[in-house]
Amino acid sequence: MKKGTVLNADISAVISRLGHTDTLVVCDAGLPVPRSSTRIDMALTQGVPSFMQVLEVVTTEMQVEAAVIAEEIKTHNPQLHATLLTHLEQLQQHQGNTIEIRYTSHEQFKKQTADSQAVIRSGECSPFANIILCAGVTF
């Protein structure tokens, strides 16, 4: 049995294949997943697992150098936005690097997901609970 944090075989595999600047999406239950993208569906029911639960596990094994977030989260989901920023700050400290945070419109965000290595769908049912993570290097 695998000893690492991520037990889900699909998530573990996609993280292990990421190269520098490759992207990975963690999203809520409502984000449309492009047909061209690999879909890893973790949603069991509304809210399970939450967006933050999935993100926290993914970032234990993924080196992150940048993140893209929809601008709309600031006004439509400020509590989750604050939680997300706190998590990214803690991740920066743990990794020992700066994580660049970029904001874009939700429409542009959806277009960018097509370029990601995979889209991991959570059971989150709150607005704009989505992030594109950009892989960094560990050296």
From Swiss-Prot:
<comment type="subunit">
    <text>Homodecamer.</text>
</comment>
<protein>
    <recommendedName>
        <fullName>D-ribose pyranase</fullName>
        <ecNumber>5.4.99.62</ecNumber>
    </recommendedName>
</protein>
<keyword id="KW-0963">Cytoplasm</keyword>
<feature type="active site" description="Proton donor">
    <location>
        <position position="20"/>
    </location>
</feature>
<dbReference type="GO" id="GO:0019303">
    <property type="term" value="P:D-ribose catabolic process"/>
</dbReference>
<feature type="binding site">
    <location>
        <begin position="128"/>
        <end position="130"/>
    </location>
    <ligand>
        <name>substrate</name>
    </ligand>
</feature>
<dbReference type="InterPro" id="IPR023064">
    <property type="entry name" value="D-ribose_pyranase"/>
</dbReference>
<dbReference type="Pfam" id="PF05025">
    <property type="entry name" value="RbsD_FucU"/>
</dbReference>
<dbReference type="InterPro" id="IPR007721">
    <property type="entry name" value="RbsD_FucU"/>
</dbReference>
<feature type="binding site">
    <location>
        <position position="28"/>
    </location>
    <ligand>
        <name>substrate</name>
    </ligand>
</feature>
<comment type="function">
    <text>Catalyzes the interconversion of beta-pyran and beta-furan forms of D-ribose.</text>
</comment>
<keyword id="KW-0119">Carbohydrate metabolism</keyword>
<dbReference type="GO" id="GO:0016872">
    <property type="term" value="F:intramolecular lyase activity"/>
</dbReference>
<dbReference type="GO" id="GO:0048029">
    <property type="term" value="F:monosaccharide binding"/>
</dbReference>
<comment type="pathway">
    <text>Carbohydrate metabolism; D-ribose degradation; D-ribose 5-phosphate from beta-D-ribopyranose: step 1/2.</text>
</comment>
<dbReference type="InterPro" id="IPR023750">
    <property type="entry name" value="RbsD-like_sf"/>
</dbReference>
<feature type="binding site">
    <location>
        <position position="106"/>
    </location>
    <ligand>
        <name>substrate</name>
    </ligand>
</feature>
<keyword id="KW-0413">Isomerase</keyword>
<dbReference type="GO" id="GO:0062193">
    <property type="term" value="F:D-ribose pyranase activity"/>
</dbReference>
<comment type="similarity">
    <text>Belongs to the RbsD / FucU family. RbsD subfamily.</text>
</comment>
<dbReference type="GO" id="GO:0005829">
    <property type="term" value="C:cytosol"/>
</dbReference>
